């Protein structure tokens, strides 16, 4: 585990660069699966107000793809990934992207589900020889493989069609596939249309989503990173103190009813503190990626993490 003190330079020019606030910071806005702190920020502008104190402008590009966030980070047009799947962060780092994890966005094993509309399919063991739709190389994919292994099956026992969550749900509801990998608000959408849950991440993976930045931005603007994390914590505090309003914001952003948001909110642990258990989960994630053939180069997960 790296500390900020060990990753910042000591020369006078480096100190000057580190203390000069950036003119603009680009931070992803990702509301799925149910990113309540981000939705709160969209409504009360906590991050923008915090950076206004240093005359720093904020852009919030909506980049939902876990693969595209690190690509944009590497290109220099993104500074902070507000909510990035642990799978995506590890894959990016193994492919040479100089990404650093600076906190945890959420842990939500119950929010990531394998679902089916076929009443004959009741457990993951029933998926042998079946077709599943969902995004490859993601937390959902990891849950599928871990669940199949627990059920005594192999990845080759099912056919996985790689597609985003909404079309996966549609394909399942239209009975074009036997099951789908589903998260967040789409779980309720699928249930309302007659689908049921075969399994979720409980007992398999913690479904860790991280907060990340580029090492270059961290080195150049460590104070901006701290500024962002403090503002993010304020959004989490708002959630705890003003639940009803937070759920109203989230319902409006997702198309859910406030009561549905209230039912789903307990699935999520938004504590940003990175714990030893989080490190263990990220190491488990790397093992999944290597075993699935999605990752070629093994990395030291501890070197991926910076504690501020």
Residue ranges and their predicted role:
Residues 36-41, 61-98, 110-124, 142, ...:
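Pocket-flanking alpha-helical
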Residues 220-294:
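Secondary-structure end/capping motifs
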Residues 18-20, 116-131, 219-223:
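Flexible hinge/capping segments at coil-to-helix
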Residues 25-31, 125-137, 237:
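Short loop->beta-strand "edge-of-pocket" segments that line small-molecule binding or catalytic clefts
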Residues 87, 157-161, 165-250:
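Pocket-lining segment of extracytoplasmic ligand-binding domains
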Residues 20-43:
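Extracytoplasmic "Venus flytrap"
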Residues 20-25, 49-62, 77, 150-162, ...:
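A local structural motif
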Residues 1-24:
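Short, low-complexity disordered leader/linker segments with a strong preference
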